[in-house]
From Swiss-Prot:
Belongs to the 4Fe4S bacterial-type ferredoxin family. RnfB subfamily. InterPro entries: 4Fe-4S_dom, 4Fe4S_Fe-S-bd, 4Fe4S_Fe_S_CS, 4Fe4S_Ferredoxin_RnfB, Elect_transpt_cplx_RnfB/RsxB, RnfB/RsxB_Proteobac. [4Fe-4S] cluster 3 binds at residues 127, 147, 150, 153. The keyword Electron transport applies. It comes from Shigella boydii serotype 18 (strain CDC 3083-94 / BS512). This is Ion-translocating oxidoreductase complex subunit B.
Length: 192
């Protein structure tokens, strides 16, 4: 019994010593990140879709900050992300890449043709935001609220049953411009 307590104490002391060494090393050799890169990375939608030409949102943020890359290449983020980055960097907003005539493209979402889906799960594996649900050899479906329209699920589909379609506008998804709606404050009379 005494040997067990000695072993427990020895392992605990070793864990404490190695933890202290790692804690000291993490502070001593810490690498400071560029705060601008961090801010740009927080603005980007984190869909890791690679439509901008970079393998993910973090490398794209680094390219914008360090290499002067265009701020208009994020397709899932669209105009809203581009405008936030332009405001952060204090630069002129640019038309979205490849869409010089239209600044606000329609939001696209993946749609699966349920009659042709064979349940191979290749689209589920390709989706960077887990917007597709389903099981092997069962029909899959896309959760449109989570879909970023990154187009990464379309190519892996062996039956070509996935397509991108614009999201239909509903009163809930419509972007109301509340500044143009006339509002009048009606005074309320208090009766005692």
């Amino acid at each position: 019994m005494n040997a067990i307590w000695i072993a427990v104490a020895a392992v605990s002391l070793l864990g404490l010593a190695f933890g202290a060494i790692l804690g000291y090393a993490s502070r001593r050799f810490a690498v400071e990140d560029d705060p601008v890169v961090e801010k740009i990375d927080k603005i980007l939608p984190q869909s890791q879709c690679a439509q901008c030409g970079y393998p993910g949102c973090r490398p794209y943020a680094e390219a914008i900050s360090c290499n002067g890359e265009k701020i208009n290449r994020c397709a899932p983020g669209g105009e809203a992300v581009m405008l936030k980055i332009a405001e952060l960097l204090n630069v002129e907003p640019q038309p979205l890449d490849g869409e010089a005539q239209e600044l606000t493209p329609a939001r696209m979402v993946a749609v699966i043709d349920e009659n042709n889906c064979i349940g191979c799960t290749k689209c589920i594996q390709a989706c960077p935001v887990d917007a597709i649900v389903g099981a092997t050899r069962a029909m899959h479906t896309v959760m449109s609220d989570l879909c970023t329209g990154c187009n990464l699920c379309v190519d892996p589909c062996p039956t070509h049953c996935i397509s991108l379609q614009p999201v239909a506008e509903t009163p809930d998804s419509w972007k109301w411009d509340l500044n143009t709606i006339p509002v009048r404050i009606i005074p309320v009379e208090h009766h005692a």
